[in-house]
Structures are given as structure tokens and as C-alpha cells.
């Protein structure tokens, strides 16, 4: 875990769910790791990069409306690893110059995307 506020800022991106007990293992499989810490019994926090956190919290009144995107260095490796853990994408988008976004939807409809630039070989 990175030193908190070492560079002066931390980003916490939230995802609200109705069923935390169902959501937490799904996010563990998607991200390939357990939470970095548990804020309380219905809130899990993953450090997805230094000073960048993904928060999954039980808040039924706000569940199902999140849209988060993480750009990663090796999109294909990320997608393959998630598939190996039983998590398959719902969709894929391709933008100008070959930039891609692979979209996952959790059991409650929240959208988590992984983005990547085209490979140098392309």
C-alpha cells in the first residue's frame, strides 16, 4: 500500500451495491486480489494504483448506477486474467486510433471498464 497522501492527493472512486456479500467476491475476482483494507463490515477498498482507490460499499439506495474506468498498461493480459477467474466482459468499445475499453457489469449493473492504448506492435 502506498504512503497515504505522499503526493498530496488520493482518489477514491465509489461503487454502491445492494448486496455487499455478493459484490465483494465478484470484485475480488475482477481485480485479482482481495481488498487492500475493509473500511467497515460493508465497505471494501482496493488500491488499484498508488493513490487511486476503488471503493465498493453497500448503499442500496444508490446501487447500480456507477460507471468507472481504469486505464491499464496491458489490457489483453488484464482481460485474460479476469476470464481465468470466471469474469467475462459484457461489451467492448474501440475508439479512434485503436484505443479500447473492455466493459464489465457487476451483478447489480454497475459498469467497470478497463481501457488500454493500442500495442506498440499494432
Q: Which residues fall in each region the model found?
A:
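Vicinal oxygen chelate
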Residues: 1-6, 15, 83-122
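N-terminal beta-strand motif that seeds the catalytic metal site of vicinal oxygen chelate
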Residues: 1-24, 51, 66-68, 118-122
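A short, compositionally biased micro-patch
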Residues: 20, 39, 49, 75, ...
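Conserved active-site tyrosine of GNAT-family acetyltransferases
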Residues: 23-28, 82, 109
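Short secondary-structure junctions
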Residues: 31-38, 87-93
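Conserved short beta-strand elements that form part of the metal-binding/catalytic scaffold
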Residues: 33-66, 111-118
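Short beta-strand micro-motifs in enzyme catalytic cores
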Residues: 42-44, 68, 98-102
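Mid-chain, well-packed structural core segment of small domains
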Residues: 68-87
